Amino acid sequence: VCDGQLMTEIPGIFSCGNALHVNDLVDYVSASGELAGKSAAHFAAHTRDEVAVTISNDFGYLVPQRLDRTQDNSAVTLYFRSAEVLGPCRVVLTVDGNEVWSRRYPFLRPPEMQQLTLDFDKLGIADASDVHFEIEVAKA
């Protein structure tokens, strides 16, 4: 489990690259290494205010699983895989039960990692906010 700055549940310990999750491209490995390094430097000088990011069972995983509200969350890169092969579907983000973002996919497959970047700073996330991703499968 890590947050949007790649810090694990152990304060001051950061994870990146394939130690965090299996990446499809080496470019993603390098980008996560840079983010982890910058985040470690920020951690040394600041306190944290975290909120959990939860997912539905249709996800195999989603990274990050937490957001630190004291950080710049205007361009958080998320990576996820579906738990199973899915036909036409929609990934939906809700904050406190209100839909705030969605994206349609013609299909999702577990071997294919998906990447998206979201501006969480504009979503009004508070201390006790429920930040949740789910996959809605289109009905035939």
At which residue positions do the language-model features occur?
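A conserved FAD-binding loop/helix module that cradles the flavin
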Residues: C16-P64
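Surface beta-strand/loop "capping" patches
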Residues: T47-G87
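FAD-site-proximal beta/loop scaffold in flavoenzymes
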Residues: V1-N23
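Surface-exposed loop/turn and secondary-structure junction residues enriched for glycine/proline
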Residues: D3-Q5, P11, Q65, T70, ...
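Residues in flexible loops and secondary-structure boundaries
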Residues: T8-I10, C16, D27, P88, ...
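C-terminal catalytic lobe of FAD-dependent flavoproteins
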Residues: D72-A140
